[in-house]
A protein has these predicted regions:
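N-proximal, solvent-exposed amphipathic alpha-helical segments enriched in charged/polar residues
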Residues: 1-30, 34, 71
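C-terminal lobe/tail of nucleotide-utilizing enzymes
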Residues: 4, 26, 45, 57-58, ...
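Residue-level signature of catalytic and energy-coupling elements of molecular machines
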Residues: 11, 29, 91, 102, ...
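Extreme N-terminal, non-catalytic leader segments
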Residues: 25-98, 373
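Walker A/P-loop phosphate-binding motif and the immediately C-terminal alpha-helix
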Residues: 94-131, 140, 151, 247, ...
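Phosphate-binding loop that captures ATP/GTP phosphates
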Residues: 121-173, 187-188, 194
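Switch II (G3) loop of P-loop NTPases
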Residues: 147-150, 168-219
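Inter-motif core of Ras-like GTPase G domains
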Residues: 190, 195-198, 217-238, 243
Length: 376
């Protein structure tokens, strides 16, 4: 009969597909116990349905099965986040989406990221923190309107095809009216969004930050247990310069930058058949190279990104010509979050990832799924 030590030795043959070292040496496999035909173990992973972590899980199950055992896997990531306050205690990963300036498609990226991770099978929320330009409900169709839990005086998010959403747009009577607020009022709204929303348990919360590096973004970074940030730019030099400022903001707050997304990268002309670079080229790639962060991908200019809140976002529109690039971007970001978490657990954070402020895992141990669940 296989012993725990022998099974651990076998599992050392399983390699983390991104970090490139075996999962036992990394310390990702913990508390192996064999009882009859079942091998139960804890894994220091925290990015549900990220492709790389799904692959790790499948390789573990195959290895355990070769020993005549059935694997019972649980996520145990008590030391991954390490953030002491109680903001979002039931949310595993907070992903900030930011830009150095407005008009680069930050909200489009945030909305498609949330919808795409939901499509992978995870439980996802989307916080529209851009108080003065709350456009998320105009991109994602709302199936269930937001509400209020009267007894607890807590807001209930709206829902778009499984994604829970909170936005200032829900609180305005006329969508054409500007949000006229000074700093203290904005802070009050954000405090309510952070403390008085019934998110439930989420695997990921995507936060659409305000553009720029002002007080609103600073306050959020000082309050939220952000696992990592995505910076959106266009190839245009002005946008690239401002994106650099945004990147430095996250560095100063010891928040891992998951990578750069270059939006409006190219335009394919259906008339002439040529692909053009209307805003130049290589801006996102250059920032990534200069700062040693990931170049997560480039999204083209395409009419399907002009969602008006009545149709599916590109990432869920399999008939779209640009669906593949959107899905690849989502998977890259999910994998990057997983990599940061596993490096944290293994104690091998590099300079890009060091000093991260993480919070406690909401459920301690969570049973790992083998396939996408039927519901969220």
């Amino acid at each position: 009969m296989t012993t725990e030590a022998e099974l651990s030795e076998r599992l050392s043959e399983v390699e983390d597909p991104i970090i490139g070292e075996d999962i036992v040496s990394l310390g990702l496999v913990r508390d192996i116990q064999i009882d009859g035909d079942t091998a139960t173990m804890s894994l220091a992973i925290n990015s549900p349905f990220a492709p790389a972590e799904m692959e790790i899980g499948e390789q573990i199950r195959e290895t355990v099965a070769e020993e005549g055992l059935e694997a019972d896997l649980h996520a145990n990531v008590d030391n991954i986040r390490g953030f002491d306050d109680e903001v979002f205690p039931n949310i595993r990963n907070v992903i900030a989406v930011a830009s150095g300036k407005g008009g680069v498609g930050k909200t489009t990226v945030a909305a498609n990221l949330a919808a795409g991770i939901d499509e992978l099978g995870a439980r996802v929320g989307l916080l529209d923190a851009d108080i003065h330009g709350p456009n998320v409900p105009r991109i994602l169709p709302i199936d269930e309107e937001p509400g209020v839990m009267a007894e607890q005086e807590r807001m209930v998010p709206g829902v778009s095809d499984g994604v829970k959403i909170i936005s200032m747009d829900f609180l305005t009577q006329n969508q054409d009216d500007p949000t006229i607020m000074r700093g203290p009022m904005v802070n009050n709204v954000m405090t309510n969004f952070l403390e008085n929303v019934e998110w439930g348990t989420l695997d990921y919360l995507v936060v659409d930050l305000p553009p720029g590096t002002g007080d609103a973004s600073l306050d959020l970074l000082q309050t939220l247990p952000v696992a990592g940030a995505v910076i959106v730019t266009t190839p245009q030099q002005m946008a690239v310069d401002d994106a650099r400022k945004g990147l430095r903001l996250f560095e100063k707050h010891d928040t891992p930058v998951l990578g750069i997304v270059e939006n409006m990268s190219t335009f394919h002309c259906s008339s002439c058949g040529e692909t053009h670079d209307p805003f130049g080229s290589g801006g996102g790639e250059k920032i990534a190279e200069d700062y040693g962060v990931e170049n997560l991908g480039a999204l083209p200019i395409h009419e399907d990104y002009g969602a008006d809140g009545t149709t599916d976002p590109v990432v869920k529109n399999e008939g779209s010509d640009v669906n593949d690039s959107a899905v690849e971007l989502v998977e890259s970001i999910a994998d990057r979050i997983g990599e940061v978490n596993r490096r944290k657990a293994a104690g091998i954070l590099d300079n890009t990832d060091s000093g991260t402020a993480f919070g406690e895992q909401p459920s301690g141990q969570a049973k790992l799924e083998t396939k996408e669940p039927d519901g969220h």
